Amino acid sequence: MLKLFSAFRKNKIWDFNGGIHPPEMKTQSNGTPLRQVPLAQRFVIPLKQHIGAEGELCVSVGDKVLRGQPLTRGRGKMLPVHAPTSGTVTAIAPHSTAHPSALAELSVIIDADGEDCWIPRDGWADYRTRSREELIERIHQFGVAGLGGAGFPTGVKLQGGGDKIETLIINAAECEPYITADDRLMQDCAAQVVEGIRILAHILQPREILIGIEDNKPQAISMLRAVLADSNDISLRVIPTKYPSGGAKQLTYILTGKQVPHGGRSSDIGVLMQNVGTAYAVKRAVIDGEPITERVVTLTGEAIARPGNVWARLGTPVRHLLNDARFCPSADQMVIMGGPLMGFTLPWLDVPVVKITNCLLAPSANELGEPQEEQSCIRCSACADACPADLLPQQLYWFSKGQQHDKATTHNIADCIECGACAWVCPSNIPLVQYFRQEKAEIAAIRQEEKRAAEAKARFEARQARLEREKAARLERHKSAAVQPAAKDKDAIAAALARVKEKQAQATQPIVIKAGERPDNSAIIAAREARKAQARAKQAELQQTNDAATVADPRKTAVEAAIARAKARKLEQQQANAEPEEQVDPRKAAVEAAIARAKARKLEQQQANAEPEEQVDPRKAAIEAAIARAKARKLEQQQANAEPEEQVDPRKAAVEAAIARAKARKLEQQQANAVPEEQVDPRKAAVEAAIARAKARKLEQQQTNAEPEEQVDPRKAAVAAAIARAQAKKAAQQKVVNED
């Protein structure tokens, strides 16, 4: 009695909350043995057929490949893919793949040559002599992934289990309607499946090995029991049919009574699960030396005249498989990859078969019924009762629809296994799984963006820290260089100090004069003369700098005078050759005369302030005075020949004459009161005298040509002329005295 009770406890099974019992529809395809499908003409092999990054390409367009030859390299979590047959690589380009949106992914396109030649195969029949690491590496490099639907790399999963796995579970439940791939594989290849299970057990060394299978597969159960008749290390557990008992968390709870923690993995509780198809692929990779190039696919549905399970090469177009099964599409025919609850509709039939493709369902219009219109949620809680993960689908629906990502995360949307039980029982025909998939994808995108932002922030902070360290190091180097001079600098400083000390010693050395000898003062005298010369040079340099800033260069002055003379000659020639009707405007001539007088005064001031050694030649000054008188006479002639209507106003001329007389008196007073040592410059006096005579003549000419009714008093004009002549004579006498 105790033994019976112990046996009952040993084979105990648990039941999970929720679940549904939809029509199984498995008899359409599980009654015929596995069969081969003729090779397609073209194969499309996506580089990514698993969870993780795609591998690195190791083939090029035009390469000849054999069946089983790697097309990519598997490093880390990157799983390689292999050629499904022999042929030629014709293209490497994006192609639509097995995805609800038919996303394009990079794929290798191979045209088959029809020979189907294998690469040399090296099987490990003695796998028990191999180490755990060698077996895991072989499984990984041969491209084995989870064939139950997740597509997680098997080698990575085994490596992560380590030594903490106590229970190895083989998932043979295959609970979704229509799918019979695992059922037929266990019926036809039970021995190979068990051999693969033993290889996994050899790697993990678990305490117990459990095979969970639903009771709706009697033929498969019989075949497994026959193979395990003489084995005590593997236990076969038959469980009630209930959807979704094939889920990883649900089957773990059914067989062990343990629940996977929220956000955790089954390995956290000492459990590792593998699919039946994965165990078979492990056997072929290790013992037969064959990479995964094909898998069992169920072809079913009322639109298929020849349903069943076939060995489909990876990369085979779906259209090719359906045509081989005598596909009879209707007007609005749909094809579902996967089961009716967890699968997705293909947008077109050129999508290739991949490692996670377990079923192609082509139902008729009567089989699935008319599509129902989505209605509003009535909060009946039927979805919550059917959820096997103990979630609240109606709340998740509202959060997903309202883009409330934080609340959806708080309500554990990540624990949803997308089994479709909630959508199956929903009376409002709401496609809840579609909302949940979209919400999970958006949350994943947000987290990925946050991760990238955090990485960018970390890189920025690291860069700032590096720049600060470099700046501190640079300042430290500069500080060290300033405090501690280099060896060259030290030598130069020492040499300079030595020279200074030597000079000081020579300067302080006493001079000894012997009797009868004269002291030698030549060195002292030379040093004194050198200092004086240096002082004079500095003073001269300073004086030249000041003169350059205030006084014009005498040579420049001479050049300007020559330019002025050239301009005067040019003007005379132009006037001499001018036509009578183009006489010079008297006002313009007066302006030019004033400009000439201003230039003459400027030149006189510059010459008067020049250094004594740079005095202008008196003869040159006399020549310039003569030029000025000639210009004055010329201006008088121009004014005399001017048109009568443009004559100067006599009153204005009288005013100018009075101003000239006042200036003459002022000049006489300045000359009379001047100190002898400050005599007027003879050149300046000569120029002023010439200017005065020119003004006098100009006034006489203006008065002579004035209109009769506006004539100035002749006596007054005569007096002014006499005064001007007297001033000129006085200036000439003063010039003679200064020259003496």
From Swiss-Prot:
<dbReference type="GO" id="GO:0046872">
    <property type="term" value="F:metal ion binding"/>
</dbReference>
<keyword id="KW-0997">Cell inner membrane</keyword>
<keyword id="KW-0479">Metal-binding</keyword>
<keyword id="KW-0408">Iron</keyword>
<comment type="similarity">
    <text>Belongs to the 4Fe4S bacterial-type ferredoxin family. RnfC subfamily.</text>
</comment>
<dbReference type="InterPro" id="IPR011538">
    <property type="entry name" value="Nuo51_FMN-bd"/>
</dbReference>
<keyword id="KW-0411">Iron-sulfur</keyword>
<dbReference type="InterPro" id="IPR010208">
    <property type="entry name" value="Ion_transpt_RnfC/RsxC"/>
</dbReference>
<comment type="subunit">
    <text>The complex is composed of six subunits: RsxA, RsxB, RsxC, RsxD, RsxE and RsxG.</text>
</comment>
<keyword id="KW-0472">Membrane</keyword>
<feature type="binding site">
    <location>
        <position position="422"/>
    </location>
    <ligand>
        <name>[4Fe-4S] cluster 2</name>
    </ligand>
</feature>
<feature type="binding site">
    <location>
        <position position="383"/>
    </location>
    <ligand>
        <name>[4Fe-4S] cluster 1</name>
    </ligand>
</feature>
<feature type="domain" description="4Fe-4S ferredoxin-type 2">
    <location>
        <begin position="407"/>
        <end position="436"/>
    </location>
</feature>
<keyword id="KW-0004">4Fe-4S</keyword>
<keyword id="KW-0677">Repeat</keyword>
<keyword id="KW-1003">Cell membrane</keyword>
<feature type="binding site">
    <location>
        <position position="380"/>
    </location>
    <ligand>
        <name>[4Fe-4S] cluster 1</name>
    </ligand>
</feature>
<feature type="binding site">
    <location>
        <position position="377"/>
    </location>
    <ligand>
        <name>[4Fe-4S] cluster 1</name>
    </ligand>
</feature>
<dbReference type="Pfam" id="PF01512">
    <property type="entry name" value="Complex1_51K"/>
</dbReference>
<dbReference type="InterPro" id="IPR017896">
    <property type="entry name" value="4Fe4S_Fe-S-bd"/>
</dbReference>
<dbReference type="InterPro" id="IPR019554">
    <property type="entry name" value="Soluble_ligand-bd"/>
</dbReference>
<feature type="binding site">
    <location>
        <position position="426"/>
    </location>
    <ligand>
        <name>[4Fe-4S] cluster 1</name>
    </ligand>
</feature>
<dbReference type="GO" id="GO:0005886">
    <property type="term" value="C:plasma membrane"/>
</dbReference>
<feature type="binding site">
    <location>
        <position position="416"/>
    </location>
    <ligand>
        <name>[4Fe-4S] cluster 2</name>
    </ligand>
</feature>
<dbReference type="Pfam" id="PF10531">
    <property type="entry name" value="SLBB"/>
</dbReference>
<feature type="region of interest" description="Disordered">
    <location>
        <begin position="694"/>
        <end position="718"/>
    </location>
</feature>
<dbReference type="Pfam" id="PF13375">
    <property type="entry name" value="RnfC_N"/>
</dbReference>
<keyword id="KW-0249">Electron transport</keyword>
<feature type="binding site">
    <location>
        <position position="419"/>
    </location>
    <ligand>
        <name>[4Fe-4S] cluster 2</name>
    </ligand>
</feature>
<protein>
    <recommendedName>
        <fullName>Ion-translocating oxidoreductase complex subunit C</fullName>
        <ecNumber>7.-.-.-</ecNumber>
    </recommendedName>
</protein>
<keyword id="KW-1278">Translocase</keyword>
<feature type="binding site">
    <location>
        <position position="387"/>
    </location>
    <ligand>
        <name>[4Fe-4S] cluster 2</name>
    </ligand>
</feature>
<feature type="domain" description="4Fe-4S ferredoxin-type 1">
    <location>
        <begin position="369"/>
        <end position="397"/>
    </location>
</feature>
<dbReference type="InterPro" id="IPR026902">
    <property type="entry name" value="RnfC_N"/>
</dbReference>
<dbReference type="GO" id="GO:0009055">
    <property type="term" value="F:electron transfer activity"/>
</dbReference>
<dbReference type="Pfam" id="PF12838">
    <property type="entry name" value="Fer4_7"/>
</dbReference>
<dbReference type="InterPro" id="IPR017900">
    <property type="entry name" value="4Fe4S_Fe_S_CS"/>
</dbReference>
<comment type="function">
    <text>Part of a membrane-bound complex that couples electron transfer with translocation of ions across the membrane. Required to maintain the reduced state of SoxR.</text>
</comment>
<keyword id="KW-0813">Transport</keyword>
<feature type="region of interest" description="Disordered">
    <location>
        <begin position="627"/>
        <end position="652"/>
    </location>
</feature>
<dbReference type="InterPro" id="IPR037225">
    <property type="entry name" value="Nuo51_FMN-bd_sf"/>
</dbReference>
<dbReference type="GO" id="GO:0051539">
    <property type="term" value="F:4 iron, 4 sulfur cluster binding"/>
</dbReference>
